């Protein structure tokens, strides 16, 4: 789709009548378990950043791991950034990803349950099983909205914000969320579920406009859905009904915090039209940066600088 058409494009993604009720019940069920935040200092050898191994209770009270990185010796209260990672990745090593702590933020990087063996390592299992699924997580538990994998992930992600806000070093009124690709999609879900974030940044976000994405790109991970439906031909309608409860377009409609989006015109993994579908639907103040000559890497470090500027404005 040409860039000029993207500005006119609107997603046709519909939302279930009980979308809000489903997510309210999901979060009520999740919050029935104590948050149980545990923080343990990690000896990394770093001199400018203090790192902590954090565990909190996510979906069903199941433990979720995260790294907390803060400027060395900081006592706060600091503005905080909760970060979600891309598909197949985990929280990585404690000495990685130092940008946000270097900018004076408390930085909580959430592990993604059941991932963390594709390009960075993770430490959080997904104890819940599922029925038949295509390799990967896109169709795990897709038989119903209750069992779908991303129900658990999005519940974890909301609890990550709550865990960050519980920390003495964090100013709970100045918590922003950020992520790229899958992490960007998770950030948009949190933006729709947590009404009082300071700001949101979604770089080349995944998990947006599933129905469109699943038919316009041959690239994984969206293609996992296509391969599943190539085998389960009769299930297209029910699968897309389930996915509508997890679509970034529907979460974006409920977002209210200032948001920064980015997209890349040569991105085959998260096609620009799917990103624009979420961008145009977003309910709060918003801006989008287009990288005309990039693929799924988007703006790389430039995306971080865009987010930093937005977060500082929101936390001033």
Regions found by a protein language model. Name each.
Residues 1-50, 103:
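N-terminal targeting or regulatory segments adjacent to alpha/beta-hydrolase or S9 domains
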Residues 66-70, 76-88, 107:
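Short beta-strand element of the alpha/beta-hydrolase
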Residues 92, 98-99, 105-155:
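Cap/lid segment of the alpha/beta-hydrolase catalytic domain
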Residues 136-180:
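Gly/Ser-rich "nucleophile elbow"/oxyanion-hole loop immediately N-terminal to the catalytic nucleophile
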Residues 188-234, 290:
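Hydrolase active-site cap/lid region
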Residues 255, 261-263, 267:
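Short beta-strand/loop motif that positions the catalytic acidic residue
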Residues 265-270, 297:
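Acidic catalytic loop of the alpha/beta-hydrolase fold
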Residues 285-305:
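Histidine-bearing beta->alpha loop at or near hydrolase active sites
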